[in-house]
UniProtKB/Swiss-Prot annotation:
Domain of life: Eukaryota
Cited function: Probably required for replication-independent chromatin assembly. Required for transcriptional silencing in the outer repeat (otr) centromeric repeats and the Tf2 long terminal repeat retrotransposons. May play an indirect role in the regulation of cdc2 and/or wee1 at the G2/M stage of mitosis.
Protein keywords: Chromatin regulator, Cytoplasm, Nucleus, Phosphoprotein, Repeat, Repressor, Transcription, Transcription regulation, WD repeat
Taxonomic lineage of the native organism: Eukaryota, Fungi, Dikarya, Ascomycota, Taphrinomycotina
GO CC terms, sorted: chromatin; cytosol; HIR complex; nucleus
Bias (Polar residues) ranges: 395-409
SMART domains noted in UniProt: WD40
Region annotation (Disordered) ranges: 144-164, 388-437
WD repeats: 62-100, 102-140, 182-221, 230-273, 276-322, 326-367, 492-526, 528-574
Annotated localization: Cytoplasm; Nucleus
Gene: slm9
Name of this protein: Histone transcription regulator slm9
GO MF term list: ATP-dependent H3-H4 histone complex chaperone activity
Length: 807
């Protein structure tokens, strides 16, 4: 990443910035400077940038009123300048005169994806639609008999020789079609839905409203995240993700922290919060592209009053980059370039920022999204009125009875022939491209207690592994699979397969490939492309498909969990419900929204593990047919041992990974400070003197049992040593004696025995989680030797270990 921050103007406040393919426009008070992008590369000097303001390659536009916002269309063909005197529209590279001035003051301005719709805001929102008309220009020759003071009108039919040339040119204008009134004060941010269905607006009245463009009605009004919003902001510039799935709204407050509230499409929930700024936020903007390396993600840039800029990855709760001290004042606007690798920003103290990123920092771009036409929803909403209007016009213009009908009039009144009605036109029709959409709901999901959201069907899906690459291409009629791998000779080979339904998910290991389709079927292939099983039909549409080693695990939309051993062609257990994971969060007065599954995977031993949005991690143990909570946010604040374990290979331990995920989910939800205040209040009360010590011991015991049930050899050994040292330090002799007795077992069993024996009413195994119990007892005796109070107990078991070794 390259950083470039020149100070363009002294004692001038910038208010907005916008970029196109060739130009960058910045506004300062009553002036707009349109600069070539050549001046903004990091190799340019600050002196050259400042000199360019008065150079011949810079266009300077001056206005009588202060400028609050400027925006290029996405293709860079038009520039809109919002002022208190009106909105000025310019054609690109024709800066001498605005081709249209929209009356009325404007504080914010926003273009739709194709530039057919324009929205401006003050206390109300004005919607304009592009209108393209044809203007005919006729140049007439002057004859020598013509009067110099009067030029007679010459028609084409009467004198064709007098016409020099006739040309037609398109004339673009924008018509006001609707004024939306719903906010109580100024609107500080506007953002169009890339799919053309909605318009989002954020106002200083502490609300964010989503408007449906087909009816201009309120689809959703959101107020809770902005109830404690500070009032010192100049702008509230929000942004819509390139796939239309999320809205990034600024200046939300969660537990006293300034956050970016991510609003999800359709449900309009705001469970995701990006925490990282120390001051109120002015603007947030999505990168215009989605990136798929290492997984699908979108990039967000945000700026606040603290003068720093943060770059976020939506797949992670923490910012991927934070750039401090870029400006002494707050940044008021951020804009990505059309390439997606440059970020421009302006601040109130006259600084212009350029952050230039490398492709390796974001990953590979996904395929270009095919957006629908901006005006499709306007046309659909008005089609009925348009038909009625045409019918009335036909009745009024039809010829009266008894009057002759001219040929020209009959041609005008005759409806145009339908192209789609002829057989030849049907053969000429091109197949429609596959558009990303949600899967068709399975009938069983309509009556289920659980409804898990299914991933969108995408035109292309790429699964890259170290042993091969699987490429999925969905079409309207069928789906194509292409797998590339290396054979035993080291040569690259590939195989293909066609499926009759759209593919939702795909995954694989070195043992098999698995793909899940929209009709609730799972196809399993060998690495060479051989179909290992007939299609496996599950209860509903698959939502999660994970695999590891020989095991394949699937969760369907009705909440049922399936797991198979593909090598042995058998199910590990019958389908299990995930209903216990979706518990409701009860409070005194209401029932809050329940958690959702954020991550899901399966271990090498075939144990499925789910990480929830509230930070809890659950594992299903088939021996007891129950879900176990292996990690939760309660331990994060009260335990002294919260954090990852350092392994010998410098790899993160499985339990450490689960606790890190719990940490991220709690911070993402903004609950960390609440738990910290709760624990501090408890520790100050009388009778809670040993609170931290007891919570730490319970945390270690939970780790021990979790690693034992999940067969985690390294985690069990390390946590057992920590647990033994902790109870020895606290002088808990009964716990130490009980632990040593369990690890020693019956003396009649040889030291290296592997068979399970019956001791009283229970069975005793010489191993646990892949570790020999008596070897673990040796490690405990060595690590607790320095505690004098425990030597009387450990010395007895040391003698018993010597006796068992002689057997």
């Amino acid at each position: 990443m390259h950083i470039f921050v020149p100070k363009l103007l002294e004692n001038h406040q910038f208010s907005s910035i916008s970029s196109s393919k060739d130009f960058v426009a910045v506004s300062a008070e009553t002036n707009v400077y349109i600069l070539s992008k050549d001046f903004f590369y990091p190799k340019s000097s600050e002196k050259r940038i400042i000199q360019s303001l008065n150079g011949h390659k810079t266009t300077h536009l001056s206005f009588d009123s202060p400028i609050s916002c400027i925006r290029f269309t996405y293709d860079g063909s038009c520039l809109a300048v919002a002022t208190e005197a009106g909105t000025f529209l310019y054609h690109s590279e024709k800066w001498d005169k605005a081709f249209q001035v929209l009356s009325g003051p404007a504080y914010e301005v926003c273009w739709s994806q194709q530039g057919h719709i324009l929205a401006t805001s003050w206390k109300q929102i004005s919607i304009y639609v592009k209108d393209e008309g044809l203007r005919t220009e006729t140049i007439v020759k002057k004859t020598e008999h013509a009067d110099s003071n009067h030029q007679p009108a010459v028609s084409i039919e009467e004198s064709k020789e007098a016409v020099e040339s006739t040309s037609q040119s398109s004339e673009i204008s924008f018509k006001l079609i609707k004024v939306i009134e719903g906010h109580h004060t100024f609107v500080g941010g506007l953002a169009f839905d890339p799919m053309g269905q909605f318009l989002a607006s954020q106002s200083f009245d502490h609300t964010l409203k989503v408007w449906k463009l087909s009816t201009f009605g309120v689809e959703k009004s959101i107020a809770k995240p902005f109830e404690q919003m500070p009032t010192g902001n100049r702008f509230l510039r929000l942004s819509w993700s390139p796939d239309g799935a999320h809205i990034a709204s600024v200046n939300a407050v969660n537990e006293g922290a300034y956050v970016i509230a991510i609003v999800q499409r359709d449900t309009w929930t705001y469970d995701i919060n990006l925490v990282g700024h120390q001051g109120p936020l002015e603007c947030a903007t999505f990168n215009p592209y989605l990136y798929e390396d290492p997984f699908q993600k979108s990039i967000i840039a945000s700026a606040a009053h603290d003068g720093c800029v943060s770059i976020w990855n939506t797949a992670c709760a923490r910012p991927m980059a934070v750039i401090h001290e870029l400006s002494c004042s707050s940044f008021v606007d951020l804009q990505w370039s059309t390439s997606g690798f440059e970020l421009y920003g302006v601040s109130l103290d006259g600084n212009l920022m350029l952050l230039q990123f490398e492709e390796s920092e974001f990953g590979e771009k996904m395929d270009t999204i095919h957006y629908p036409d901006d005006l499709s929803y306007f046309n659909s909403s008005r089609s009925k009125a348009h038909v009625n209007k045409n019918a009335a016009a036909d009745r009024t213009t039809s010829p009266t009875q008894g009057q002759p009908e001219s040929p020209s009039k009959s041609i005008l009144l005759r409806p145009p022939p339908s192209i789609a009605s002829s057989p030849e036109s049907k053969r000429r029709k091109c197949p429609k491209k596959f558009v990303a959409r949600p899967p068709v709901p399975h009938p069983t999901s309509l009556y289920s207690q659980i409804r898990i959201g299914c991933p969108y069907l995408k035109p292309k899906l790429v699964i890259s592994k170290s042993f091969g690459t699987l490429i999925v291409k969905n079409h309207n009629q069928l789906s194509l699979l292409k797998c590339t791998f290396s054979n035993l000779d080291g040569n690259d080979c590939s195989w293909f397969s066609y499926l009759p339904n759209a593919i939702v998910l795909a995954n694989g290991t070195s043992v098999f490939w698995a793909v899940a389709t929209e009709d609730s079927s799972i196809y399993i292939y060998s690495p060479a492309g051989r179909l290992l099983l007939p299609p496996v039909v599950v209860a509903a549409t698959p939502c999660f498909l994970e695999c590891c080693g020989d095991f394949l695990c699937c969760i369907v939309s009705t909440g049922l969990l399936y797991i198979w051993n593909i090598k042995n062609f058998e199910a590990i257990h019958s389908p299990v419900s995930t209903l216990p994971l979706f518990h409701s969060n009860f409070s005194v007065s209401k029932i809050a929204r329940g958690p959702s599954i954020e991550q899901f995977f399966v271990t090498k031993q075939g144990h499925p593990v789910a990480i929830m949005s509230d930070g809890n991690a659950f594992a299903f143990i088939r021996d007891s047919s129950s879900w176990l909570r292996v990690s939760e946010g309660w331990w994060m604040i009260g335990s002294q041992y919260w954090g990852p374990l350092a392994s010998e290979s410098n790899e993160e331990s499985p339990l450490g990974f689960l606790e890190r995920c719990t940490d991220e989910e709690i911070i993402k939800a903004g609950r960390g400070r609440f738990l910290q205040r709760l624990v501090k209040a408890l520790m100050l009360r009388q009778g809670y003197d040993n609170y931290e010590m007891l919570v730490s011991i319970r945390h270690l015991e939970n780790r021990l049992m979790s690693s034992a049930k999940l067969d985690l050899e390294y985690d069990f050994r390390e946590n057992l040593i920590l647990y033994a040292k902790k109870i020895a330090e606290e002088g808990m002799k009964d716990k130490m004696d009980e632990l040593c007795k369990e690890l020693l077992g019956p003396l009649r069993i040889p030291h290296n025995g592997i068979d399970t024996v019956k001791v009283g009413n229970r069975l005793w195994s010489p191993t646990i989680a892949g570790n020999n119990k008596r070897n673990l007892l040796k490690d405990i005796i060595i690590h607790t030797a320095k505690y004098r109070d425990m030597q009387r107990i450990t010395s007895q078991y040391s003698d018993l270990l010597r006796r068992s070794a002689l057997l």
